[in-house]
Amino acid sequence: MKRRPGMSVPEFREYYETKHRLIGEKYLNGYATRYVRRFTNPNMDRDGQLRDPEYDVFLEIWYPDQATYEACGKALSAPEVAKEIQEDEEKVFDIRFMRSYLVEECESDLT
């Protein structure tokens, strides 16, 4: 996800970790087993130029199974819950750049 225009990186991280995260925890509790935020940092591109990342945070939410994921989705779509989440998202994110994916993990054993 990308921070809203006009918000600095430190402001974004502070808001996310002190406010938005708490909303996530409130509604994910009892469904998700992990709620992880991975904040991005500037990185060198192939030309050796330091570039700001396209996105500011990647969010991972882990569920124990498909049924729990679906139950959480249903709970999050309740009108009062969806309204609270959306209103806070608009304070911190550039919602034009919000993306969501359901993924499967494949891990290599490198030992």
Regions found by a protein language model. Name each.
Residues 1-111:
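Macromolecular interaction modules
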